[in-house]
Swiss-Prot record:
Catalyzes the S-methylmethionine (SMM) biosynthesis from adenosyl-L-homocysteine (AdoMet) and methionine. SMM biosynthesis (by MMT1) and degradation (by HMT-1, HMT-2 and HMT-3) constitute the SMM cycle in plants, which is probably required to achieve short term control of AdoMet level. Also able to catalyze the selenium-methylmethionine (SeMM) from AdoMet and selenium-methionine (SeMet). May play a role in phoem sulfur transport; such function is however not essential. It comes from Zea mays (Maize). Homotetramer. Pfam families: Aminotran_1_2, MTS. It comes from the Eukaryota. This is Methionine S-methyltransferase. The gene is MMT1. Keywords: Cytoplasm, Methyltransferase, S-adenosyl-L-methionine, Transferase. The lineage of its organism: Eukaryota, Viridiplantae, Streptophyta, Embryophyta, Tracheophyta.
Length: 1091
């Protein structure tokens, strides 16, 4: 009796402490929890709680009275009432207080959904429950399914304290003794509760989870300011309780539906859940089932609806925020009148019905979600949370077709890793990214047993570009081309009839006549024998591609008549782990490809982008594959890096799981010796390839520092990477989102004062180099002559000579900054018919000097007088860093003020967006043609490789930032200009201290310098031996230090070399060291001006 009296006394004391208020009740409960945490006082504290429960256990009304009077209650929550036998009427004993969520229909439905999982789903797993409230679901889950650990997490600190009390209530019996399960563990071994904003506790403690379950708020608080308060256990009861009903804006697109907190929970879950993990969420159906399911699917989840029912809308939850959302959008939420209503009503109607005393319900579903390709999806979200949160609203990883998902998700993961790891544009050879060529060679070796090296593979933007480039390289008098492959060849080649007497024709005049041929091999062979072409380009019929017989017949007949053979296998190469039989590749597995033959393949067979193409050529003749790589460098610049990455990812997926070199390579028969009468490269190609300074690749032993390239390797701003990534994560991009025409019009108007509206045609190209070379072909079609100022980009001059264009040099001099002087231009134009004048500006490449508005006015006036076409190349402009006294161009005003002009006069504006938009590595060229006849001629050269839809989307976004003068983006451009200015000053200082005479420019990414102190000096090192001059110093520096510059042969200016300085910071510093080291090697410790 004394014990009972003492117990009653303790209960009375506890209740007295609770009487004053909810805060007082919480304080009393917290004091009991401290005793429960301490092993010595734990049994007594548990006995006290048992006595309190028994005091009010007589009826439900007694429990309600306790809640009103003492601001808490302890009662039983009945689980699994339908389970028979010894488990019948299993229950949990739970404490509740006013400031935390009280279990009701919402959470009971969630538990029912969890119940629909098989028992094994949680057994021995690490689980987190989000929004655990008083902990009943975490405890029930641990009690029923025996997980390894359950972490109950809640942002409400009072909820966490009460959850711990409830854990002790159910882990210990009324005598305070532990209750052990069949594995000898108690609930205290399996469950822990922590204060946590969603999964922050697990993230901070690096806990990996097998399962995440959550039943969290999905209505925006009608008082947003209330949600901005800091959550503490001393916050008001009303505020803490609101955390259970409402959520704040989370910065997700789902905020508009009240699902922002769920969205954040899902994305946080992706970072901590194991690859095989499962998330289970309670989803109110108010936004509509499609919206709820899309939240998961667009983040890469497969979903299963475990359970759906209707529940009454809680009367204490204000839905006015949903009414407001309907007012501002076309979306309608879904409610029902009472539980029996089957026709949905909108939030506004539901709100009005509730205000009038009606009762409304909404659907409630429990979804089980599992990531598809979890490791890749995790990489994508790691990238997004690293400063790219704004892109997440565009993310769409929902796919109806698994094959599309299996292709696109790995690519997005690769792209995320690439953008994250490469802060600047990596330096890749024009022949194709080395890694991509390795992957192509690896695929051929692993799947088709052909021992290729990356050098054997040359990458092109498209198959049509590869065919046209090859024909320009050889410039045959007659070529036979498969009728399926002629669609993009120049019309002039297909209409020429210069077949008779071709043996006597001048191989250097560039005339190419193409005859269309049927694909069937017997008919093609008959044509080859009769016409004896110098080049044959063909594909193969499907039935003939199965065996190698047709290919061998083509090899033999082309060898016999002295023809080069380019065989297209685009339709027969399968990017599959089980590719079908291919006769051409079977042949190559056993025999070396003869020197007169090459394989072409256009890659368009992907599951996602039908218009995304990359092509490659395979040759085992060193002279041919080297010449092809140099041809693409001159005529195209390079192939889109992103396109190579896309197909590279496909090849990687096919190779990543294989054990390398598992099978010994079979011996191949050597290639047959080909007779000498085989056509060689055209005379203009031979002389150009010999004289041009091409890209110098590095080796495994030593890397090259490139100060000889027209590319920027400065850090790529996050705004650019975000736009690139968004262009791929989006689905169903509209035409208006990729239409850059108006944006380019605005750019040229703002930058150069040119109005490109009306009849002007804007044509896009992968690079400005490719567009320039189409203009060269237009000039040749008009039988015109290209006029280049002395000091023009050496590759442009070489490209014109490669295709045998007629060229004239306009003299320039250092005193005028290598600008064209009007009088000199006029004197030159007097002696030229049909002139095309090339002007690079406002920034001149490679000198870095600027043309002012008055300069361009005078030049255009002279050109108008002589009826010249003018190609203004703005590709290297937009990065002017010394503009004091310089006046921006006003081309529209200039053109309208011309007093006289010949009818043949017109202006073509050539441009490249990557420099002006700080998007190094992502090229986008454009040309604006105001002359309709010229536009028609341009279109006749239809092999132009155009930017993919994703690039158009990227540059549309970047142009929007620039044209709208976005402050952050404008600051980035200013920073890049300042960086270039600092680099230029440092380079000038280094050059002048090392015996060079620098020509100091005002913009761009390069400058000229004269090796004054080195002229005539004898030098011998690493394979170089001779007297130094401005034309051979490139080779000497390269061999001695690994630094590559352009010599005077490239600049065209006697005595002047070119240094490009938009390098990655570390590379730039190494380059400065190389310049100093070369001075030491040649001049020793001699003091120079500026030293």
């Amino acid at each position: 009796m004394a014990a009972l009296a003492g117990e009653d006394k303790d209960v009375d004391a506890f209740l007295a402490d609770c009487t004053a208020s909810g805060d007082a009740a919480y304080g009393a409960a917290k004091a009991v929890l401290e005793r429960l945490h301490a092993p010595a006082t734990r049994p007594a504290a548990r006995r006290l709680l048992g006595a309190v429960r028994r005091r009010f256990a007589a009826s439900r009304a007694a429990g309600e009275d306790c809640f009103r009077t003492f601001h808490f209650r302890i009662h039983d929550v009945v689980l699994d009432p339908h389970v028979q036998g010894f488990q019948q009427m299993k229950k949990l004993t739970m404490m509740e207080i006013p400031s935390i969520f009280i279990p009701e229909d919402w959470s009971f439905t969630f538990y029912e959904g969890l119940n629909r999982h098989p028992d094994s789903i949680f057994r021995d797993k690490t689980v987190a429950e989000l929004g655990c409230g008083n902990g009943w679901i975490s405890i029930a889950l641990a009690e029923k399914w025996c997980p390894s650990k359950v972490y109950g997490l809640d942002i409400n600190p009072r909820a966490v304290k009460i959850a711990w009390i409830n854990l002790y209530l159910n882990a210990l019996d009324d005598d305070g003794l532990p209750i052990y399960d069949g594995e000898g563990k108690t609930l205290l071994d399996r469950v822990e509760f922590y204060e946590s904003d969603l999964l922050s506790y697990c993230r901070d403690n690096k806990i990996e989870l097998d399962r995440i379950v959550g039943c969290i708020p999905q209505i925006l608080n009608p008082n947003p300011e209330a949600m901005s308060k800091i959550v503490t256990e001393n916050s008001s009861e009303e505020f803490l309780y609101a955390l259970s009903n409402y959520c704040a804006l989370q910065g997700f697109v789902e905020d508009q539906f009240g699902l922002g907190l769920i969205a954040r929970a899902v994305e946080e879950g992706i970072s901590v859940i194991k690859p095989s993990g499962i998330m289970v969420f309670n989803m109110g159906g108010r936004p509509g089932q499609g919206v709820c399911e899309r939240l998961f699917r667009r983040r890469g989840f497969r979903i299963t609806k475990l359970w759906q029912t209707k529940i009454m809308q809680x009367a204490d939850t204000d839905i006015s925020a949903l009414v407001e959302x309907e007012k501002n959008s076309r979306h309608r939420f879904e409610f029902f009148m009472d539980l029996v209503g089957b026709q949905p009503i909108c939030a506004r109607t539901a709100w009005a019905y509730m205000k009038s005393g009606g009762h409304i319900s909404h659907a409630l579903s429990v979804y089980s979600c599992q990531l598809r390709q979890p490791n890749q999806v995790k990489k994508i979200f790691e990238f997004l949370k690293d400063g790219f949160h704004e892109v997440s609203s565009s993310l769409d990883l929902s796919f109806d077709d698994d094959s599309v998902a299996e292709e696109k998700i790995p690519f997005l993961a690769y792209l995320a890793s690439f953008l994250k790891e490469n802060k600047s544009n990596p330096c890749e050879p024009p022949a194709g990214c080395l890694n991509f060529r390795k992957l192509v060679a690896g695929f051929m070796k692993s799947y088709h047993h052909i021992p290729l090296t990356p050098d054997n593979v040359v990458v092109f933007p498209s198959r049509s570009v590869a065919i046209e480039n090859a024909l320009q390289l050889f410039s045959p008098a007659l070529a036979i081309v498969d009728e399926h492959l002629t669609r993009h060849l120049p019309k002039q080649w297909l209409t020429s009839l210069a077949i008779e007497g071709r043996a006597d024709c001048n191989h250097a005049d560039g005339t190419v006549t193409v005859i269309e041929a049927p694909r069937q091999s017997d008919l093609l062979i008959e044509l080859i024998r009769k016409l004896q072409p110098q080049v044959v380009v063909t594909g193969m019929a499907q039935f003939e591609a199965i065996t190698s017989a047709a290919f061998e017949n083509l090899l033999n007949v082309t060898k016999d008549v002295g023809s080069r053979l380019f065989l297209d296998i685009s339709e027969h190469l399968e990017l599959s782990s089980l590719p079908s039989s291919n006769g051409v590749l079977k042949y190559l597995a056993g025999k070396t490809l003869p020197s007169h033959a090459a394989i072409l393949c256009g890659l368009v067979k992907n599951q996602v982008y039908s218009d995304l193409e990359v092509a490659f050529a395979i040759s085992e003749d060193a002279a041919v594959y080297k010449a092809l790589s140099q041809t693409i460098e001159l005529l195209e610049g390079h192939t889109s890096l992103i396109s190579q990455h896309y197909y590279g990812c496909l090849f990687h997926e096919l190779l990543a799981f294989q054990i390398a070199d598992r099978h010994p390579q079979q011996e191949r028969q050597p290639a047959e010796v080909i007779p000498q009468q085989m056509i060689g490269f055209s005379d203009p190609a031979v002389s150009t390839l010999k004289a041009t300074e091409f890209f110098v690749p590095g080796s495994a032993e030593s890397s090259i520092i490139h100060m000889d390239l027209d590319r920027s390797f400065l850090p790529v701003p996050s705004a650019v990477n975000a736009s690139v990534f968004e262009s791929f994560v989006r689905q169903n991009i509209t035409d208006s989102e990729t239409d850059v025409r108006s944006s380019i019009q605005q750019l040229v108007k703002d930058s150069y004062g040119l109005s490109a509206a009306g009849c002007a045609e804007i044509i896009y190209g992968n690079t400005s180099v490719a567009l320039f070379n189409k203009l060269v072909l237009c000039c040749m079609q008009e039988q015109g002559t290209l006029l280049f100022p002395l000091g023009t980009n050496g590759h442009y001059v070489s490209a014109a000579k490669f295709v045998n264009a007629s060229t004239v040099t306009i003299p320039t001099n250092p005193s005028s900054g290598f600008r064209i002087e009007p009088k000199v231009l006029a004197d030159t134009l007097k002696n030229v018919s049909r002139p095309w004048v090339y002007v690079c500006g406002p920034t001149i490449n490679p000198t870095g000097f600027l043309y002012s508005d008055s300069d361009i006015r005078e030049l255009l006036s002279v050109c108008a007088e002589y009826g010249a076409r003018v190609v203004i190349d703005t590709s290297f402009s937009g990065l002017e860093y010394e503009t004091d006294g310089w006046r921006q161009w006003n081309l529209a005003g200039c053109l309208s003020s011309l007093k006289r002009s010949e009818p043949s006069f017109s202006v073509v504006l050539l441009g490249e967006l990557s420099f002006a938009l700080t998007a190094g590595g992502h090229d986008f060229g454009f040309v604006i043609l105001g002359d309709s006849s010229l536009a028609e001629t341009f279109h006749s050269f239809s092999s132009l490789s155009r930017p993919h839809t994703t690039l158009k989307y990227t540059f549309k976004k970047l142009l929007g930032l620039k044209n709208q003068k976005d402050q952050h983006f404008s600051d980035l451009i200013v920073e890049q200009k300042e960086e270039l200015k600092n680099r230029a000053n440092q380079l000038i200082q280094t050059l002048e201290s090392c015996g060079w005479e620098a020509a100091i420019g005002c913009g761009g990414i390069s400058m000229l310098a004269k090796p004054t102190a080195y002229m005539g000096k004898a030098f011998k090192a690493a394979g170089f031996d001779g007297e130094l001059d401005a034309s051979n110093i490139r080779e000497a520096i390269l061999r001695a230090t690994g630094l590559c510059i352009n010599s005077s042969s490239w600049t065209g200016i006697p005595g002047y070399c070119r240094f490009s300085f938009a390098l990655e910071r570390g590379e730039f510093e190494r380059a400065m060291g190389c310049i100093a080291r070369f001075k030491e090697l040649v001049l020793g410790g001699a003091q120079m001006n500026g030293a």
